[in-house]
C-alpha cells in the first residue's frame, strides 16, 4: 500500500504539548499520532491508529495459535452482575456510573469478567463443552483520579482481555501456561525490553499472578530482580520471616526520658548517649516505628490502622494500598489524632495499639518484628520511649503486614541473591481467577460423573493502547519516535527532497515498486523544504527511509536506518532490492 503525505491527515508540531510529562506523550502528540480531547481521553489519528492495529493483529495471531476465540461485548453494561460480585462497590470512584432514562444503574465497563462468565453460563452446561478460551479487544473505562502521561494512564483505553474456563485446576494450569507462552511471543514481537514479574491480583481476586512490564526508567511500577532469577513487582514481594528468638534472659522493659526525640535520628542519638550498648552503637534498625494511617473502605466506613516496622525503614504506601485494595489509604490528620487522644504523636508505642487495647486501633507489624526481638519504641507519653520492649513478651500485635520499603541489595525472599530495583510500565497481567466469579454468578457444569461442579477461570489482560506508548517510550530518542519494524505504521518512508519533477518521479517509482512488492510505504511528496522533510521523518520514526535528492544526478539514493542512524548510498537501480532485503531480512 502506498500513502502520499500530501494526502495524509497529519500535522507535526515543533513545540512540546504543555501537559507532556514523559517522552512518549511528547512525541506521540508532536508527531501527530494522538490528540488530547479531555484529561485522560485521546483521539487516535491515522498514524497512531495504524500502530495500534498492527499490535492488535499480533495479539489476534497469537490468540488464534492457542485456540482462543474472539468475541465483543458492549462497553455500556448493566450494573446487576457487578453488584452480585461486589465490584460495584469495590471499584469505588474508579467506576464510570450512569443511569438510563428509567433511572436504572449502568456503567462503562472497566473489565468484563462478569460478562464473560454469564455468557458461558447461558450457553454451556457440560464438561464436554470445556476447556474454552474467549477474548476481546475493546475500549475500557476507568475514572482515574490523576490521569497522566498521555495514553499511559488514561480514563479510556484499549485492552485485550481473555478468559479461560476449565472444569479443574489442572486444566486451568494448562490454560495459564498457554496464555503465558502466547504473551511471551507477543512481547518478543513488540520489540521492547520487558520483564515478567510476580504480581498482586488486586480487586480481580485469584491466586497465581504475573505482570509483563515494559522496562522504563520513568515507569510507574517498581520491580525487583535477583541474579538467581527471582522477579516481582515490589507490591508482591514477601520477605522471608525470621525465626522467633528466645525470650528468657532478656532485660526488662524500661521507660526512659527522651526529650525532643520525635525522629528516629534524634532517638538513636539520645539512646547512644543515655543507654549506650556494650557491643555496638544503637541504630535505626533497633527502633520500632509505629505509623498510623486512616483506611477508607468502599462502603464509606473509615478505620485507623497502625503499622509497626523497624525505624530504618519507611512504609511503602503503594505496597500498603496493594495489600488493602480496594480500600484507600489516607494520611492520619491532626483531627484524627484529636479524636484518638491515646495516640501521642511522635511517641506512639504498642501499649496504646491493638484491638484489645483502649484505642481499638488495629496494629499490624512488619515480619521482622518476631517473638523475642527487642525494641526501642514510643512509651505513649511525650518525650518518653521504652527500651528493651520485647515482642511476644511485652506486646502482641493483631497481625503481620509486609509493606516496608524494599531496598537495593535486600536479600531475595527465595535466597537467590540480592535484589536490584528497576522501574517499568505494566502492559500485561495474567492470573488464575479460580472460582471467584463462577461462584458469585453460578457458573456450573455437569462433570463426567453427572455432578454439578463450579467452573474455574483464568484472566489475561494486555493494554493495547498502553503498549503503543510503552514502545514509543522505550525506543524514542532526542529526535523523535523510532518504531520497531513489526509495529511501525509504515515499513518504509520515501522522501523526495529537491526541486524538479525528476526527483519526485523517481521517488514515486521507488515507492510504487516497494508497495507492489507488499510493503506499507509512506511517500513524502509534499512541497516542503528538505530540512522540514528530514525533521518530520525523524519525528515520525519509520524504521527505514529512502531519500531521493541531489544524489540522483549521480544515479544514487540514500537508505537510512532510523534505529542505528546508519546511512548508506545505493544505486537507483538497486534501491528497491536493497530496501526489500533490509525490511525482510
Curated annotation (Swiss-Prot):
Q: Which keywords belong to this entry? A: Aminoacyl-tRNA synthetase, ATP-binding, Cytoplasm, Ligase, Nucleotide-binding, Protein biosynthesis
Coiled-coil spans are none
One cellular component term (GO) for this entry is: cytosol
Known EC number: 6.1.1.15
Q: What is its main location?
A: cytoplasm
Q: Where in the cell is it found?
A: Cytoplasm
Q: What class of enzyme is it?
A: ligase
Instruction: Identify one Pfam family in the record.
Output: tRNA_edit
Is the Lyase keyword given for this protein?
no
Subunit structure, per the record? Homodimer.
Function noted in UniProt: Catalyzes the attachment of proline to tRNA(Pro) in a two-step reaction: proline is first activated by ATP to form Pro-AMP and then transferred to the acceptor end of tRNA(Pro). As ProRS can inadvertently accommodate and process non-cognate amino acids such as alanine and cysteine, to avoid such errors it has two additional distinct editing activities against alanine. One activity is designated as 'pretransfer' editing and involves the tRNA(Pro)-independent hydrolysis of activated Ala-AMP.
Q: Which PANTHER family match?
A: MITOCHONDRIAL RIBOSOME PROTEIN L39/PROLYL-TRNA LIGASE FAMILY MEMBER, PROLINE--TRNA LIGASE
- Domains as described in the record: Consists of three domains: the N-terminal catalytic domain, the editing domain and the C-terminal anticodon-binding domain.
Family under the similarity heading: Belongs to the class-II aminoacyl-tRNA synthetase family. ProS type 1 subfamily.
Protein name listed in UniProt: Proline--tRNA ligase
Q: What is the lineage of its organism?
A: Bacteria, Bacillati, Actinomycetota, Actinomycetes, Propionibacteriales
Amino acid at each position: 500500500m502506498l500513502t502520499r503525505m500530501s494526502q495524509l491527515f497529519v500535522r507535526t508540531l515543533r513545540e512540546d504539548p504543555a501537559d507532556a510529562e514523559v517522552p512518549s506523550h511528547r512525541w506521540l502528540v508532536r508527531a501527530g499520532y494522538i490528540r488530547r480531547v479531555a484529561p485522560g481521553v485521546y483521539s487516535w489519528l491515522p498514524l497512531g491508529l495504524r500502530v495500534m492495529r498492527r499490535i492488535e493483529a499480533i495479539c489476534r495471531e497469537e490468540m488464534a495459535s492457542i485456540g482462543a476465540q474472539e468475541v465483543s461485548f458492549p462497553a455500556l453494561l448493566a450494573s446487576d452482575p457487578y453488584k452480585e460480585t461486589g465490584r460495584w462497590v469495590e471499584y469505588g470512584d474508579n467506576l464510570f456510573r450512569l443511569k438510563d432514562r428509567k433511572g436504572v444503574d449502568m456503567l462503562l465497563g472497566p473489565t468484563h469478567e462478569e460478562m464473560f462468565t454469564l455468557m458461558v453460563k447461558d450457553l454451556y452446561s457440560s464438561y464436554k463443552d470445556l476447556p474454552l478460551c474467549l477474548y476481546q479487544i475493546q475500549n475500557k473505562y476507568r475514572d482515574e483520579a490523576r490521569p497522566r502521561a498521555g495514553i499511559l494512564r488514561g480514563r479510556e483505553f484499549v485492552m485485550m482481555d481473555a478468559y479461560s474456563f476449565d472444569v479443574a485446576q489442572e486444566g486451568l494450569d494448562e490454560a495459564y501456561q498457554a496464555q503465558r507462552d502466547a504473551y511471551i511471543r507477543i512481547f518478543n514481537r513488540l520489540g521492547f525490553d520487558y520483564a515478567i514479574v510476580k504480581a498482586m491480583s488486586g480487586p480481580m481476586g485469584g491466586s497465581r499472578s504475573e505482570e509483563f512490564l515494559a522496562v522504563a526508567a520513568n515507569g510507574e511500577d517498581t520491580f525487583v530482580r535477583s541474579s538467581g532469577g527471582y522477579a516481582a513487582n515490589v507490591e508482591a514481594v514477601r520477605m522471608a520471616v525470621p525465626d522467633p528468638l528466645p525470650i528468657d534472659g532478656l532485660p526488662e522493659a524500661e521507660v526512659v526520658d527522651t526529650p525532643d526525640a520525635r525522629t528516629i535520628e534524634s532517638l538513636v542519638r539520645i539512646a547512644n548517649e543515655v543507654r549506650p550498648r556494650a557491643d555496638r552503637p544503637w541504630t535505626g534498625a533497633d527502633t520500632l516505628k509505629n505509623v498510623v494511617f486512616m483506611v477508607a473502605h468502599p462502603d464509606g466506613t473509615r478505620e485507623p490502622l497502625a503499622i509497626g516496622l523497624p525505624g530504618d525503614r519507611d512504609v511503602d504506601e503503594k505496597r500498603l494500598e496493594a495489600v488493602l485494595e480496594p480500600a484507600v489509604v489516607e494520611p492520619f490528620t491532626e483531627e484524627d489524632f484529636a479524636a484518638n487522644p491515646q495516640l501521642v504523636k511522635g511517641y506512639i508505642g504498642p501499649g496504646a495499639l491493638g484491638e484489645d487495647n483502649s484505642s481499638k486501633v488495629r496494629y499490624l507489624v512488619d515480619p521482622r518484628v518476631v517473638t523475642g526481638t527487642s525494641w526501642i519504641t514510643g512509651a505513649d507519653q511525650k518525650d518518653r520511649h521504652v527500651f528493651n520492649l520485647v515482642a511476644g513478651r511485652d506486646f502482641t500485635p493483631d497481625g503481620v503486614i509486609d509493606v516496608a520499603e524494599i531496598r537495593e541489595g535486600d536479600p531475595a525472599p527465595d535466597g537467590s541473591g540480592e535484589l536490584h530495583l528497576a522501574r517499568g510500565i505494566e502492559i500485561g497481567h495474567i492470573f488464575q481467577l479460580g472460582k471467584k466469579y463462577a461462584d458469585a454468578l453460578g457458573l456450573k457444569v455437569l462433570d463426567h460423573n453427572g455432578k454439578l461442579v463450579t467452573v474455574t477461570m483464568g484472566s489475561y489482560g494486555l493494554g493495547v493502547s498502553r503498549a503503543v506508548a510503552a514502545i514509543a517510550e522505550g525506543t524514542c530518542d532526542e529526535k523523535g519516535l523510532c518504531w520497531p519494524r513489526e509495529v511501525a505504521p509504515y515499513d518504509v518512508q520515501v522522501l523526495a527532497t529537491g526541486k524538479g519533477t525528476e526527483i519526485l518521479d523517481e521517488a514515486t517509482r521507488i515507492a510504487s515498486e516497494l508497495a507492489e512488492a507488499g510493503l506499507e510505504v509512506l511517500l513524502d511528496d509534499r512541497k516542503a523544504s528538505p530540512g522540514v522533510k528530514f525533521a518530520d521523518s525523524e519525528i515520525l520514526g519509520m524504521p527505514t527511509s529512502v531519500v531521493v535528492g541531489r544524489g540522483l544526478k549521480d544515479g544514487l539514493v540514500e537508505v537510512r536506518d532510523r534505529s542505528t542512524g546508519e546511512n548508506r548510498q545505493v544505486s537507483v537501480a538497486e534501491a528497491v532490492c536493497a530496501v526489500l532485503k533490509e525490511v525482510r531480512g
